[in-house]
């Protein structure tokens, strides 16, 4: 974020923004940064307190996921959402200062925008509808090229409908 940012909370509040941030612990470090017993409990409590602080700014930590063995360089992913991108950025910094993450390396950080669906206004992310987070997270970006917008709107609607139906039979996935 730069100091001359012109985004206001009212403008940013029109959409949801999400961040997916992956952290890796140092190679060869035993356990999680050498934390054991009471130290691990203190570190977890400190992290929970930081999560509560960022919640006061309008940022929700949707989940903390174990991604070890899923990515070459990554052990834990933090998924957050909010309506102001700068608040998400500040929340990442706040969480990184906790003992649980301070010795890690941020190996991936991506911000995305969840906007109103083009053809189905009722299609909103599960978190925006108040659904409880699940144990596993599966996501992918639906990136649209310039050519996408050259297609006839009816064809785009058909393709999106077909695309959305692909996951309907998967009971563990909330679309």
Protein language model regions, located:
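Short S/T/G/P-rich N-terminal loop/turn motif that feeds into the first structured element of a domain
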Residues: 1-56, 83-87, 107-171
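Long, hydrophobic/aromatic-enriched structural stretches that serve as scaffold segments
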Residues: 47-88, 92
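Conserved small/polar residues in nucleotide/adenosyl-binding loops
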Residues: 173-175
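A common structural junction motif
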Residues: 95-103
